[in-house]
């Protein structure tokens, strides 16, 4: 169920003293398949935030078992206030709440030795459980340097800018397929198999916990700073309606390049993602009722 199918892993190799960050999203968590599972306030959300917290704790167990001395969990879904702090493994710290300068990747610039993408999902325009990129429906596609980009690909590019390797990615099978391309050395944990955007064949929490803990421990063999990959980047965003492209093109660095498409260049990935966040915020604010 992981990229290396957990074969031939041998004995556990401890890597002491490593600082790790976990970027935790919810759509790719154990059992999640439906909108109400991840929308704050619904009865289903209250149930699945516990499963989400369980996934995080399973990863924390593996990271700490393999020698991680400091783990920061960046809560990265929606309001970014979904994980249950009172149930979190006490060996971790949690960054919770919105309006973080680096959003899902807040903390990657603090000298960490590796990052885990937990509960991730496929990008807008692709098959996958609850697939999207930042906005649930308004964005139909994102491209990073002419390559279709999920949140995982965008975040991996930011991690590379700080010399931080992606150690592990978890989610459905489509998420794992995506990660094989943008982070081929990462451990992968498939917690469910996509049937449609709103249906999946799911493994029970006891099984996913075992997989997540084992893969997290194995992933620590790759922990350690790498050479920073800094350079210019271009992001293009396609929307489901023309007025969203018009609205976001008011940003000085953003150009409307098609009826529903905008693009912009940035000197580095950090600045690219800051601009992308502004694009998504303006687009979300321009949605008008059932017409979008």
Task: Identify what each model region corresponds to.
Residues 78-91:
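Glycine-rich loop at the start of a catalytic domain that most often binds anionic cofactors/ligands
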Residues 23-29, 77, 118-124, 173-174:
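Short glycine-enriched loops at secondary-structure junctions
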Residues 36-60:
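Short catalytic helix/loop segments, enriched in acidic residues and glycine
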Residues 90-108:
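A glycine-rich helix N-cap at a beta->alpha junction
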Residues 100, 136-162, 170-174:
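Active-site glycine-rich loop that binds ribose-phosphate moieties when present
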Residues 208-292:
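C-terminal accessory domains and tails appended to enzymatic cores
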Residues 16-20:
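Extreme N-terminal starter segment of soluble prokaryotic enzymes
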Residues 158-220:
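Active-site rim beta-loop-alpha module in soluble metabolic enzymes
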């Amino acid at each position: 169920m992981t990229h290396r199918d957990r074969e031939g892993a041998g004995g556990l190799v401890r890597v002491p003293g490593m600082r790790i960050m976990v970027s935790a999203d919810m759509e790719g968590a154990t059992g999640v398949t439906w909108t109400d599972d991840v929308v704050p306030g619904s009865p289903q959300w209250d149930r699945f935030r516990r499963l989400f917290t369980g996934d995080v704790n399973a990863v924390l167990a593996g990271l700490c078992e393999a020698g991680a001395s400091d783990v920061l969990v960046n809560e990265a879904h929606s309001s970014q206030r979904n994980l249950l702090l009172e149930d979190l493994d006490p060996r971790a710290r949690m960054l919770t709440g919105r309006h973080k300068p680096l959003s899902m990747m807040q903390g990657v610039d603090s000298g960490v030795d590796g990052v885990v993408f937990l509960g991730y999902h496929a990008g807008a325009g692709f098959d996958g459980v609850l697939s999207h990129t930042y906005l649930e429906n308004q964005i139909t596609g994102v491209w990073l340097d002419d390559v279709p980009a999920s949140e995982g690909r965008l975040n991996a590019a930011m991690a590379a800018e700080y010399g931080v390797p992606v150690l592990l990615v978890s989610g459905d099978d489509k998420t794992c397929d995506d990660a094989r391309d943008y982070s081929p050395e990462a451990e992968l944990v498939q917690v469910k198999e996509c049937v449609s955007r709103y249906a999946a064949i799911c493994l029970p929490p006891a099984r996913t916990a075992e997989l997540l803990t084992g893969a997290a421990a194995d992933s620590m063999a790759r922990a350690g700073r790498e050479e920073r990959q800094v350079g210019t980047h271009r992001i293009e965003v396609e929307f489901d309606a023309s007025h969203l492209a018009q609205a976001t093109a008011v940003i000085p660095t953003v150009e409307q390049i098609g009826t529903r498409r905008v693009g912009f260049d940035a000197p580095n990935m950090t600045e690219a993602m800051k601009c992308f966040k502004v694009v998504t915020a303006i687009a979300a604010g321009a949605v008008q009722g059932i017409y979008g």
